[in-house]
Structures are given as structure tokens and as C-alpha cells.
Amino acid sequence: MTVTANQVLRPRGPQIERLTDTRAKVVIEPLERGYGHTLGNALRRVLLSSIPGFAITEVEIDGVLHEYTTVEGLQEDVLEVLLNLKDVAIRMHSGDSATLSLSKQGPGVVTAADIKVDHNVEILNGDHVICHLTKDTAVNMRLKIERGFGYQPAAARRRPDEETRAIGRLVLDASFSPVRRVAYAVEAARVEQRTDLDKLVIDIETNGTIDAEEAVRTAADILSDQLSVFGDFTHRDRGAAKPANNGVDPVLLRPIDDLELTVRSANCLKAESIYYIGDLIQKTEVELLKTPNLGKKSLTEIKEVLAQRGLSLGMKLENWPPAGVASHGMLG
């Protein structure tokens, strides 16, 4: 148990209890009284609204002009098929969009496993039923996959210059969040003679494209990033206080693992002693392409991930590395 400068208890590291492959409980304790609900509610909201994921956003089905078309030999109506497609759990290793296809000859059951994927795309719930073919007929689909977060209705994603939708292109309401359910409970905790402390228990279930504990960590990172803007405000008011790490943006001190790059890209960077985001952004494209086993595809992935955070390659940093950052990739 440690105490911060203002005497507020700092909890121990989270304890993880895996319940299933997609569900886990995360326990954080001890917390000051009231902090359980403060942190639990904030984390729950971010988990449900802001964790990025992938979803099917557009569908084209041979012979289908609109959502209300009747297809002979198809047990479900088209609307039900579209609803089933929204529940396909998809993970992409790089990039923000892809186009997949599905072809199946009936009679029989059409499942998510029938979707043709490449090495960059995974279907996590291959047994998920999309539709049933009752006759000797075929179904052919083209599916557009996109990256996003939260829930986005089809109307919100329609381009402003798109006056009319292409006939046969069915736009879906997309739920990008990989988090299916989150609940939290606050229980009593005790440390030595203090019995008025909180224990936060977060029960989280995902669609399998992300681990429950990874989702909680990402939510905590998002909250930390949002709250970090108040740090400068506080320092200005205190006057005498000095920013840590010689004024270096805390984002640059985060390990490259926080970028969620593919394993190949991350290992290539670490092999070149690039451990922090601050190390990475100072490299140029030419320098990175000289890295063994790091090709143009990995370079594109790195540039896209940095751009999402308002960063780019080839940036110049003064006083890097700051005090406390060791060359072996650990904060000293």
C-alpha cells in the first residue's frame, strides 16, 4: 500500500479472474471511500462507448435491391440477415477497412465461417448463423468491414455528397464496440485498521476480438489521456510546480505496445531499441524501412496508428530521452 503526495490511497495492481474466454472480472483495491463508484462509472461508460473495433458496415447481396426484397430459397427475410451480419465478430491485424465475400450453395446453414478472409482478417465466432438456405440455391454477398468505435447509425455514416444510395448497396447500423456487457460493483475493503475503503469489481464481457483485461486497460488509457490536460492547468496555478520529465508530453513516454501494432511490427521496432512512442516518432520513413523484416505494409500501419494520435514520423524532440527513461525500455 502506498500513499500519494496528497495522502490519497493508491490501489494495488488489478487482479484478473478469467470466467470464460470472453468474460473476466477485474478487481481493484483498496480505494478511498467513494472512489469505487467514481472510477467504476467512468470506466463503464468509456468501455461501452469508446473502445475501437471492427464491424460490417455495408452489404451487397446478388439479386437484392433493398432491405425488403424477398429471396427465394432463403428462410429469413433480408432484414433478419442484415441483423445477423451485425453480430459477426471481426478482428483486423492492420488497416482500417477491407472488403470480404461470402458464397454458399444450398440447401444448408450459412455461418460466419463461410466468409472468405485473408491473413489480415479473423472471424472469431465462425459458428454464428447468418441465414438458412432451404433450396438448391446460392447466396453471394460482398461485405465491407470498417474500423470505428461506439454505435453509428447508417444515416450518420452516409457521405454528405451522396445524394442517392447505390441500388443494391445496403448500409448497416454499425456497433463497432467489442465490449458486449459491463457491470461493476463496489464492495467493502479493509487495510490494517481502516474499514471504510472500497473494492471495485468490474465484470466485463467482450465479443472475443479483445481480451477483457485489455479492454479495461484501453479504457483507463483513454481516461488518463483526457484527464492529462488538467495537469498543465494545475501546474500553472501552483506556479512553483515543475512538469515532470522536462515538459515531455506523457504520450511520448508510453511504450510502443500501447499503439497495438501487429506482433511483427512491434518486434521489429524493439529489435532496433525503439521502446517508446517518443523513440518512434523521431525515426524517418527511410530509417524504418532499413529495419530488418519491416516492410512497406508495416510502415503504413505505423503511420496510420501515429496519425490517429496526431503524431507522425520524422518529428524532432529536444531533451530526449528525458531523465528516468532507460535505453532498455523501462522507466527508471
UniProtKB/Swiss-Prot annotation:
Gene3D superfamilies on file: 5' to 3' exonuclease, C-terminal subdomain (1.10.150.20), DNA-directed RNA polymerase, insert domain (2.170.120.12), RNA polymerase, RBP11-like subunit (3.30.1360.10)
Region named Alpha N-terminal domain (alpha-NTD): 1-234
UniProt entry tagged with the keyword Zinc: no
Enzyme Commission no: 2.7.7.6
Keywords: DNA-directed RNA polymerase, Nucleotidyltransferase, Transcription, Transferase
Biological processes, Gene Ontology terms: DNA-templated transcription
Catalytic reaction(s) noted: RNA(n) + a ribonucleoside 5'-triphosphate = RNA(n+1) + diphosphate
Keyword check for Transferase: yes
Enzyme class: transferase
Region (Alpha C-terminal domain (alpha-CTD)): 248-332
Pfam name, any one: RNA_pol_A_bac
GO molecular function per UniProt: DNA binding; DNA-directed RNA polymerase activity; protein dimerization activity
Alphabetical list of InterPro entries matching this protein: DNA-dir_RNA_pol_insert, DNA-dir_RNA_pol_RpoA/D/Rpb3, DNA-dir_RpoA, RBP11-like, RNAP_asu_C, RNApol_insert_sf
Any GO CC annotation of this UniProt entry: DNA-directed RNA polymerase complex
Subunit organization: Homodimer. The RNAP catalytic core consists of 2 alpha, 1 beta, 1 beta' and 1 omega subunit. When a sigma factor is associated with the core the holoenzyme is formed, which can initiate transcription.
Function statement: DNA-dependent RNA polymerase catalyzes the transcription of DNA into RNA using the four ribonucleoside triphosphates as substrates.
Recorded family membership: Belongs to the RNA polymerase alpha chain family.
Written domain comment of the UniProt record: The N-terminal domain is essential for RNAP assembly and basal transcription, whereas the C-terminal domain is involved in interaction with transcriptional regulators and with upstream promoter elements.
Name of the protein in its database record: DNA-directed RNA polymerase subunit alpha
Organism from which the protein derives: Stenotrophomonas maltophilia (strain R551-3)
Gene that specifies this protein: rpoA
